[in-house]
């Protein structure tokens, strides 16, 4: 295997050969390089270009297939596939490849032009309207912004941000520049910045629907559902029959808890776009959240019947914990997984769905293989580094030493309303939330992002700054600022509450911010939902999360995260003695009554029988565990990880001494 610098040196030699049209010489060098660096996608891409110019079309397609196996969303590989098929006069395959290329990367002008030309040549000009509109928008954009779109599509976010900021300094009111910078901010987790940019964009250009839709999506991510719904209503009023606008409104209605309206609108869309797979899948999500599992299954299956490569629908079926795939469905999923043209995202969905399918069949080796593949796909797209979070946790402990905590015992907002349930995902937090929210004095909400958003705001300091100011900057905050942050949290979260005096925030990752919570909300209750490390970590590893939780994409990564979590919780116990109630999942399963009374006593609540029969709730539940918590206490999952123990040595080794706290 060559070093990266050696590969780059060969490519630097080859590029002038390509520009000079010396394709045979270039091909020879690139074939050798492809043997020495078989997974270098840029080298393979240049080889495929050479092969096309040499009319070695079959060889070019083989080379492009190699790229797509390594990187399924390599947009230029799909575009080059289109060029090859077009040279072979296979216009149908060419059209599909060009379409896939622009789905991944909207900046590929030649793929847009090629689609329009093919459709016109094959007497299908009625399908060119949207493509011509997209091309006109792209041609009208300043070249730097086209470059930004291209970099975003390649996940080169730092370069994209630098280029976009440089452009915006010269053109501060360019709406598309604002929209793209907001898109980068959203991907980097800077939701405050993204919201500000998009709010400004729609002020300058109220009729810019792309900016408004992006604004709605950011509002949803920040769980400002009321404003997101209002914006969706404004969008719909512009064109009530537009299925895209209807879909946005339906999704925001669902997020706001109005599932009847959402389902009604989804049905209206299906009258315009019969059996649209995306709409059917969203409809299935709404039905699932309402507890209508059978109807959800039907909706997901209809989506698959319409579009067999729709991986999200398959995974949505797998995520219905009480659902089992038929043999025919498993065969169909494997066939789609083997298809080269399928998107990276669909492949990921299919791998996790196949893992669940084979686990249900007790074929654990095969199940693990698919879980591992699914995580590998996610890992490729992730920039997560365990060392960065380890350092952040250590910084929390360094700032919140005993002296600092002693100086800040009387700070913050005195409201006792919040009950934080923290820990790792898949640790039983949904179970604890359902128990507590069944009490008459407690409102259940969801995983609220407000504390994470505050931490992110403190971390970034200036807008889109790359310098971290959290937690190191906390000692500089005044008592007034700390109180205001607490009051802001109470105010912002009120939209999710009913009339009960207490409410739950079950965002698991808030354990990282127990110090901050104690500074701004000293009377809040904090419950640490803990589960056996092997069970918790493997359950996270086999779960495909909608977003975030990047530490779950590898056994070593999730083991490191769990170990660091335990170490940080030990520190919080030391500096805030008695502040956090630890609830062990296995103990809740073994003795529900005792643990429920213990939890209620900690929260200062009288015992209510409804907390024991929590599974009778009619409330919408928005987590992967939603089917489980509608059943009496879920005992079968306590030792599921042992079915996979033969494959979990890397996890055991990473957890190290943490495992010694638990019986084997």
Language-model features and meaning:
Residues 256, 290, 445, 449-479, ...:
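PAPS-dependent sulfotransferase catalytic domain
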Residues 363-365, 369-485, 630, 634:
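PAPS-dependent sulfotransferase catalytic core
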């Amino acid at each position: 295997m060559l070093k990266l610098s050696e590969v780059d040196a060969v490519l630097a030699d080859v590029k002038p050969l390509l520009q000079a049209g010396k394709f045979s010489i270039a091909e020879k060098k690139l074939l050798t390089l492809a043997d020495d660096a078989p997974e270098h996608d840029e080298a393979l891409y240049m080889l495929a270009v050479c092969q096309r110019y040499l009319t070695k079309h079959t060889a070019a397609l083989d080379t492009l297939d190699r790229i797509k196996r390594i990187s399924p969303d390599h947009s230029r590989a799909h575009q080059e596939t289109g060029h090859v098929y077009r040279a072979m006069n296979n216009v149908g395959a060419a059209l599909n490849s060009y379409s896939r290329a622009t789905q991944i990367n909207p900046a590929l002008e030649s793929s847009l032009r090629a689609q329009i030309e093919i459709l016109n040549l094959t007497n299908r000009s009625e399908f060119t309207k949207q493509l011509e509109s997209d091309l006109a928008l792209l041609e009208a954009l300043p070249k730097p912004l086209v470059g930004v779109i291209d970099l975003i599509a390649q996940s080169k976010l730092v370069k994209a941000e630098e280029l976009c900021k440089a452009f915006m300094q010269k053109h501060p009111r360019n709406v598309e520049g604002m929209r793209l910078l907001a898109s980068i901010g959203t991907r980097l987790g800077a939701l405050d910045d993204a919201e500000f940019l998009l709010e400004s964009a729609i002020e300058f250009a109220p009729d810019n629907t792309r900016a408004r839709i992006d604004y709605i999506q950011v509002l949803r991510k920040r769980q400002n559902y009321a404003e997101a719904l209002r914006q969706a209503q404004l969008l719909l009023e512009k064109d009530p029959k537009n299925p895209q606008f209807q879909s946005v409104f339906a999704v925001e209605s669902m997020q706001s808890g109005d599932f009847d309206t959402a389902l009604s609108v989804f049905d209206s869309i299906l009258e315009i776009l019969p059996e649209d797979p995306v709409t059917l899948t969203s409809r299935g999500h709404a039905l699932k959240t309402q507890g209508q599992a059978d109807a959800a299954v039907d909706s997901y299956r209809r989506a698959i019947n319409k579009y067999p490569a729709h991986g999200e629908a398959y995974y949505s079926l797998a995520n219905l914990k009480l659902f089992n795939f038929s043999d025919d469905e498993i065969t169909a999923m494997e066939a789609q997984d083997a298809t080269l043209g399928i998107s990276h995202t669909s492949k990921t969905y299919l791998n996790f769905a196949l893992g669940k399918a084979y686990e249900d069949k007790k074929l654990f080796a095969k199940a693990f293989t698919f879980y591992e593949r699914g995580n590998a796909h996610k890992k490729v797209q992730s920039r997560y580094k365990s060392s960065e979070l380890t350092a952040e946790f250590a910084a929390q402990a360094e700032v919140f030493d005993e002296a600092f905590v002693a100086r800040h015992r009387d700070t913050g907002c005195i409201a006792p309303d919040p009950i934080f349930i923290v820990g790792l995902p898949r640790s039983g937090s949904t179970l604890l939330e359902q128990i507590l929210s069944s009490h008459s004095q407690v409102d259940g909400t969801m995983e609220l992002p407000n504390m994470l958003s505050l931490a992110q705001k403190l971390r970034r300091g200036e807008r889109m700054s790359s310098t971290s100011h959290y937690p190191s900057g906390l000692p500089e905050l005044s008592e007034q600022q700390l109180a205001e942050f607490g009051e802001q949290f109470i105010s912002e979260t009120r939209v999710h509450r009913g009339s009960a005096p207490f409410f739950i925030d079950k965002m698991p990752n808030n354990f990282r911010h127990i110090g901050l919570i104690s500074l701004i909300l000293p009377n809040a209750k904090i419950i640490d939902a803990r589960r056996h490390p092997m069970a918790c970590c493997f359950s996270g590893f086999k779960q495909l999360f909608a977003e975030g939780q990047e530490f779950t994409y590898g056994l070593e990564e999730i083991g490191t995260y769990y170990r660091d979590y335990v170490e940080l919780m030990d520190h919080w116990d030391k500096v805030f003695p008695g502040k956090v109630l630890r609830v062990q999942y296995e103990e809740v399963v073994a003795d529900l009554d005792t643990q429920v009374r213990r939890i209620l006593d900690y929260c200062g609540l009288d015992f209510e029988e409804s907390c024991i029969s929590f599974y009778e709730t009619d409330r919408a539940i928005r987590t992967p565990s939603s089917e489980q918590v509608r059943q009496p206490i879920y005992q079968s999952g306590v030792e599921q990880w042992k079915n996979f123990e033969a494959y979990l040595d890397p996890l055991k080794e990473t957890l190290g001494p943490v495992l010694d706290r638990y019986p084997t």
